[in-house]
Each structure stands twice: as structure tokens, then as C-alpha cells.
Amino acid sequence: MSKFFRRRKFCKFTAEGVKEIDYKDLNTLRQYLTENGKIVPSRVTGTKSKYQRQLATAVKRARFLALIPYTDNHDV
């Protein structure tokens, strides 16, 4: 038997009953971005594939409208 118990991942959007992810909800979108601005994969976050696709679309829309940056590291 293993010593450590890995906590089961669950989809926060399913638990909260979200129907569609809004691109204007920046606090939610930032939870699913890395510090470099990349979208975190669903195998890490535990989101269902339906919501992961909506999340990716919402992040891309927010980036296009300059609500969130494409990258956070700008070393000049």
C-alpha cells in the first residue's frame, strides 16, 4: 500500500453549477493560468473536458481583448 493518499480532483464548475464560463470573470480565469500565462491542463486541475474547452476559449477571448496578458514575463 502506498504511504500517501492523493486527493481526488473534482471539477469546480460542475460543483458550482456553472453553465458557461464568462471571459469577463478574470479572477476565475487567472486561477487556471500559470505564472507565465499558460493555460493549466485539465489533468492537473481536474476540470471536465466540456469546461476545459470553454475555459480555453474564454482565456483566448480575454487575451484578444487585452483583459489578461498573453505572457507575464517580459524580460527586456
Swiss-Prot record:
Keywords linked to the UniProt accession: Ribonucleoprotein, Ribosomal protein, RNA-binding, rRNA-binding
Subunit structure: Part of the 30S ribosomal subunit. Forms a tight heterodimer with protein bS6.
Described purpose of this protein according to its UniProt entry: Binds as a heterodimer with protein bS6 to the central domain of the 16S rRNA, where it helps stabilize the platform of the 30S subunit.
Cellular component terms per the entry's GO annotation: cytosolic small ribosomal subunit
GO molecular function, one term: small ribosomal subunit rRNA binding
PANTHER family xref list: 30S RIBOSOMAL PROTEIN S18, SMALL RIBOSOMAL SUBUNIT PROTEIN BS18M
Entry keyword annotation includes RNA-binding: yes
Protein name (Swiss-Prot/TrEMBL): Small ribosomal subunit protein bS18
GO biological process: one example: translation
Alphabetical list of NCBIfam families matching this protein: S18 (TIGR00165)
Species whose genome carries this gene: Stenotrophomonas maltophilia (strain K279a)
